[in-house]
Amino acid sequence: MAVTVDLDTDCAQLVLDVGALTLGEKNRKKMKSHHLRKRENENISQAVCTLLNSGGGVIKVQIENEDHNLTRDGLGLDLEASLFQCLPFVNWHLDITEDGGYVYIFVKSWSLDFFGLLIATLRTNLYTRSMSSSVEVNAAAALEFLQDLKETGGRSCVGPELPAQRVCPGVEEESHVEDLATPVFNKTQFQHQEDFPFSRSTFVEATLLSGKQLQKRIKELIPRHLSAFANTDGGYLFIGLDGNEQQIIGFEAERSDLEHLESEIDKCIQQLPVTHFCEEQEKIKYTCKFIPVHRPGAVCSYVCTPRVERFCCDVFSAEPNSWHVEDSCVKRFTTEEWVKSMMDD
């Protein structure tokens, strides 16, 4: 069940209905459906976030298991953890009661003075590269990133020039890794189990996928890694490289499959939410290559390599996980709405 506004309540406060949930640690551990358990946790987190952004209110939870007693059984540790997602000090902002087959969670309004931010957010979905990882930044760091972009009117799509001389001779710099990756990207073919001369870095991500999981995993990897590269200084995602052995393996695919895969990658990139603080309002610039991997006598697999350029402003992997009530409906902030709400003076 989706989180909905209870329009039939006699309560003077805003009431959100999350439907029937299994409550209590023992009963939640017995739940057979992992998907249902995950969905219930997501609904609780979403409801708390929504009320924090809507002046506070009440979450109405129907108790699925009739023998539940709040004092004896509690909510369940996983549901409690879901309450923590928005609220580090739960007891200061929530009160929980049980009455007539329902649990009611009373949520106070969000406070700028207390939290230092204008709205509550479960996930920003804003990634940057940090050394060799794509890292999602928290709301406070996202605000700082956005404020910097606003002050400068965006940023140049060309990264800052690095010193010609290395500070520590013999130490491999991040920029040197990019220099090693570029010739590999420019190749027209590889030999199976050929070595490649670089590791993961700020500019490079390498991963090995099988043909069976290829399309699903690419849809998961593209938004996170390419948005992170775009928000940093650009970079390469090599799909088909064994990072542990530093060998080129590739993934098995028919030639006819590559066109469909390229179309899916393009769709993923075009759907990435962006906001602008610059006049140019440019689109995400990228190049995608499929490079054949040869065994003696035949092509046996392919390496897929999207390369994305540094972006002028900010790229999100998805709309931020933040909700509010509008026109008696629970609505997710669009990226533009979220950015405006975070930065509203």
Predicted feature locations:
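Conserved N-terminal catalytic/coupling substructures associated with nucleotide/phosphate chemistry
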Residues: M1-D345
